[in-house]
């Protein structure tokens, strides 16, 4: 089987360029179904999840052309298939984001329930609540969902019980061609929401308030083409910032927007890192010397501490001096990495959605399993400071969210390889 093998690599040093954000690219690619003219997207990350959603679009009738490694042209002018492919939908959760665009453009869609990271229930009921509020009729079974709006969608008011990113995005896209005004209350505020709104407006949509808890969309008759650059991936940036901290390194993260990751910057300073922001160059330098001290984090919807960096920060906490704690409030069942870190000698106790960590002097290399995307990243970070050799298995999870993570770490001086080992 293929593993990522990591050997102790202290004092990482150098620069790393961050790719476009996966969590922005996926909804924007889905939204490309709305345009009746070609769309060009730049800084599209080369990831497994991205290739899956592009295949979904091709199955629906879009023409997808790579102009270079990170530039894609999507022509959805001839899309007329409203049924999503079952085998592709089953591979990735974000594939559900095509439902809103198909519903508003074609008046109907049949889709299969999605797969992806097994983090808690992550239900799609908020998406469906939004579609119903816009006048769609929904029929669902355990496997598939059908939505129909015979006479088109009609603007409405939607209150989200939780500021779900996916639901906010799906409802925004569905509302772009609904008759009248749609108001989403308690909307997600993530930078990826703002990026999607920016893209939709380039297509000719009328979206206001993205980045606040109230988003207003006035429906238009049709949307056209556009050129758009995906924002940098704040989670990838945070991962390499934590890598600098855990290895007592000096790493400059390029192509990142510091205002998108303020909680990470604040917490790294709290544990004892020097963090230098250079907004003119969109870069952040993280310098760590000596042993860092423990801290507390509580995951929250944006602009709070991101749940997608919880596992990586916990890896850092395992070797900080003193006690640390984590409270996970966004997703249930998001401590699957704890057992793997414990195999490496981490002193972690969990109760419900809380974890307490007693910092240890050193971790030990082990064979550990990447249980989800961010857990995989956390185990690589732990391997960088563990004595001996760490083999991270199930690395397909890591490939879903990081493009060429091994070569990026190598450039910083890490002893890391993708290799085949016997099962």
Curated annotation (Swiss-Prot):
One of its GO terms (biological process) is cell wall organization. It is an enzyme of class 2 (transferase). It comes from the Bacteria. GO terms for cellular component: cytoplasm. It is found in: Cytoplasm. The keyword Cell division applies. Pathway: Cell wall biogenesis; peptidoglycan biosynthesis. Its EC number is 2.5.1.7. Phosphoenolpyruvate binds at residues 22-23. SUPFAM superfamilies: EPT/RTPC-like. Keywords: Cell cycle, Cell division, Cell shape, Cell wall biogenesis/degradation, Cytoplasm, Peptidoglycan synthesis, Pyruvate, Transferase. The modification 2-(S-cysteinyl)pyruvic acid O-phosphothioketal is found at residue 117. It catalyses: phosphoenolpyruvate + UDP-N-acetyl-alpha-D-glucosamine = UDP-N-acetyl-3-O-(1-carboxyvinyl)-alpha-D-glucosamine + phosphate. The keyword Repeat does not apply. Belongs to the EPSP synthase family. MurA subfamily. PANTHER family: UDP-N-ACETYLGLUCOSAMINE 1-CARBOXYVINYLTRANSFERASE (PTHR43783:SF1). Cell wall formation. Adds enolpyruvyl to UDP-N-acetylglucosamine. This is UDP-N-acetylglucosamine 1-carboxyvinyltransferase. The lineage of its organism: Bacteria, Bacillati, Bacillota, Tissierellia, Tissierellales.
């Amino acid at each position: 089987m293929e593993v990522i093998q990591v050997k102790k690599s202290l004092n990482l040093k150098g620069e790393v360029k961050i790719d476009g954000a996966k969590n922005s690219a996926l909804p924007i690619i889905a939204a490309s179904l709305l345009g009746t003219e070609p769309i060009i997207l730049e800084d599209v990350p080369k990831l497994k999840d991205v290739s899956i959603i592009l295949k979904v679009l091709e199955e629906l009738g879009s023409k997808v052309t790579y102009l270079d490694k990170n530039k894609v042209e999507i022509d959805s002018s001839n899309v007329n298939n409203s049924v999503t492919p079952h085998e592709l939908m089953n591979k990735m959760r974000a594939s559900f984001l095509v439902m809103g665009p198909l519903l508003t453009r074609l008046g109907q869609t049949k889709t299969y329930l999605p797969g992806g990271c097994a983090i808690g229930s992550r239900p799609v009921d908020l998406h469906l609540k939004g579609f119903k509020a816009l006048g769609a009729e929904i029929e669902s079974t355990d496997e598939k969902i059908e939505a129909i709006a015979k006479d088109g969608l009609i603007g409405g008011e939607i209150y989200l019980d939780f500021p779900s990113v996916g639901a906010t995005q799906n409802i925004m896209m569905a509302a772009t061609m609904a008759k009248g005004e749609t108001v989403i209350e308690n909307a997600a505020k993530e930078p990826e929401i703002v990026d999607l709104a920016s893209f939709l407006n380039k297509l000719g949509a009328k979206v206001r308030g993205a980045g606040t808890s109230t988003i207003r969309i006035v429906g238009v008759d049709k949307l056209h083409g556009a050129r758009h650059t995906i924002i940098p991936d704040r989670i990838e940036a945070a991962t390499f910032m934590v890598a600098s901290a855990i290895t007592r390194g000096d790493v400059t993260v390029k192509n990142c927007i510091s205002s998108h990751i303020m909680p990470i910057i604040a917490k790294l300073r709290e544990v004892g890192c020097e963090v230098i922001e250079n907004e003119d160059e969109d870069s952040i330098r993280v310098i760590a010397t000596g042993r860092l001290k423990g801290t507390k984090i509580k995951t929250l919807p944006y602009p709070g501490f991101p749940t997608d960096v919880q596992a990586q920060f916990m890896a850092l906490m395992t070797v900080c001096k003193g006690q640390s704690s984590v409270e996970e409030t966004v997703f249930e069942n998001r401590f699957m990495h704890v057992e793997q870190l414990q195999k490496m000698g981490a002193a972690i106790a969990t109760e419900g959605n809380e974890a307490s960590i007693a910092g240890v002097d050193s971790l030990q290399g082990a064979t550990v399993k990447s249980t989800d995307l961010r857990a995989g990243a956390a185990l690589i970070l732990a391997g960088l400071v563990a004595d001996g050799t760490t083999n991270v298995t199930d690395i397909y999870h890591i490939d879903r969210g990081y493009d060429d993570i091994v070569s990026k770490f190598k450039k910083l001086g890490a002893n890391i390889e993708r290799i085949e080992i016997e099962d």
